[in-house]
Amino acid sequence: MLKMESTQQMASSIINTSFEAAVVAATSTLELMGIQYDYNEVYTRVKSKFDYVMDDSGVKNNLLGKAATIDQALNGKFGSAVRNRNWMTDTRTTARLDEDVNKLRMMLSSKGIDQKMRVLNACFSVKRIPGKSSSIIKCTRLMRDKIERGEVEVDDSFVEEKMEVDTIDWKSRYEQLEKRFESLKQRVNEKYTSWVQKAKKVNENMYSLQNVISQQQSQIADLQHYCNKLEVDLQNKISSLVSSIEWYMKSMELPDEVKTDIEQQLNSIDVINPINAIDDFESLIRNVILDYDRTFLMFKGLMRQCNYEYTYE
């Protein structure tokens, strides 16, 4: 005999359809919010969360188990259905269900969803009207049952609350604000005046310093011009002195070797740098004095050999 599992297949189909609906709801919400997403990533994340919730809460196994019981009853096996009926009517099962309901209520209370909110959400639902800002409030079956049991009251009383109006003296408030504004204005003006005076003093000092710098620059330029002129004059004087000595040497009756030696020493004088030229002149004068001293000693020795005497006049 062919086994019938249509109820289990239907339950499995409902679960799969619920998962697809969850994926569509998630992607459409992201599109409405303008958030770009990867469909495969959203699909994977929703599937992982959906499978975890369905398995961890036991909802999936509960639905498939009840569907299997119905299929067994349809196949003529009523033992499982009888056991489920006995289990559902057992006092321990009822106590367990009450315990689960109480846990859920306490969980909702811990999340800030109090009894009033739970009752109102259970008694009413809101139906939006397309194209309009208004909506329709619908009563649920629980609300209808409460009306039938007389558990709904209409409070027509209107409590008129007297609105307390504080009397404010706007004139005194304005005067206080005006005084504060004038005081603030005066402080700002004083600070601004002090800043202007400091700025003027800084500008005066800066202009004075600029004048001093300009005068010093002018004096430095004059001194530089004088130094350059003095250096040129010294160079010309040294060059003229060298030429004069050279001309005077050539007019003397000296041997050619002596003239050549003195000429080489004159040519070695640095006419560009006056300091070096003075050192060269010093060396030349020392050499001349040394030659004169040697000549005098030779002349003195010669006169002694000839038995002559000499005197300075």
Swiss-Prot record:
BP terms from Gene Ontology: regulation of translation
Entry-linked InterPro entries: NSP3_N_rotavirus, NSP3_sf, Rotavirus_NSP3
Coiled-coil regions listed: 166-237
Spans annotated as Interaction with host ZC3H7B: 170-234
Keyword Coiled coil: yes
RNA-binding, as annotated region: 1-149
Entry annotated with the keyword Lyase: no
Interaction with host EIF4G1: annotated segments: 208-313
Subunit and partners: Homodimer. Interacts (via the coiled-coil region) with host ZC3H7B (via LD motif). Interacts with host EIF4G1.
Protein's name according to its UniProt entry: Non-structural protein 3
Record lineage: Viruses, Riboviria, Orthornavirae, Duplornaviricota, Resentoviricetes
